[in-house]
Amino acid sequence: MDDDGMGSVQVQWQISSDGNAWMNLTGAVQQSFTPRETHVGQQLRVQISYVDGQGNLETLVSPASTPVENVNDKPTGAPRLTGEAREEGALVVDTSLIADEDGVGTYSVIWQRSSTKTDWQAYPNAVGEVLQLTQSHVGYSYRAVVSYTDRHGTKEMLLTSPSETVANVDDPVEGEVMLTGDAAEGSTLVANTARVSDEDGIASLTIGWESSEDGRNWRAIETSGAS
């Protein structure tokens, strides 16, 4: 209240990190002001100016506020998986779309897997942003759990969408079939398959015998068996 009258009131909000040196907040010229992340930990006050009926410039300053307290801001955006879900491929976590007004710390990535895309289990065999896919991953879908601690000490956690089910790639047969026994009339030859392996697994094994007179041209022997 001013007995000399009050003209148009000008409002200016100010900010200080120590309560002594004050700076005007650009654009903060309304009677209400909403603090944001950039103001956390600093004090605010408002300065009111007007010209009274006698032409005098009058200025009033409010007491300083207490330091602005942080309110956790939830992250926006989400991590996503890139790469091809197939054996011998790789799934890579892309975190470029994650943003947090409170700041983003160092990412920690763990993996989960599921054969149904509903019942997820921790997959402790892999950590980090890249999952190299091998035969052991075939038939499962994977997702990544991305976590970090923001600038104010709040731990945030985000999930990627599930990958497609990892597809199998045919793995070549390894090893060789060994023949034991004497190659003589009346003797028995045995096909030893103990050294044969296949990363895809061996569901069944069929043995067929062939004969050749010159080692180049082969024909099937009608009576075949394991020996």
Range-by-range predicted roles:
Residues 1-227:
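Ser/Thr/Pro/Gly-rich low-complexity disordered regions
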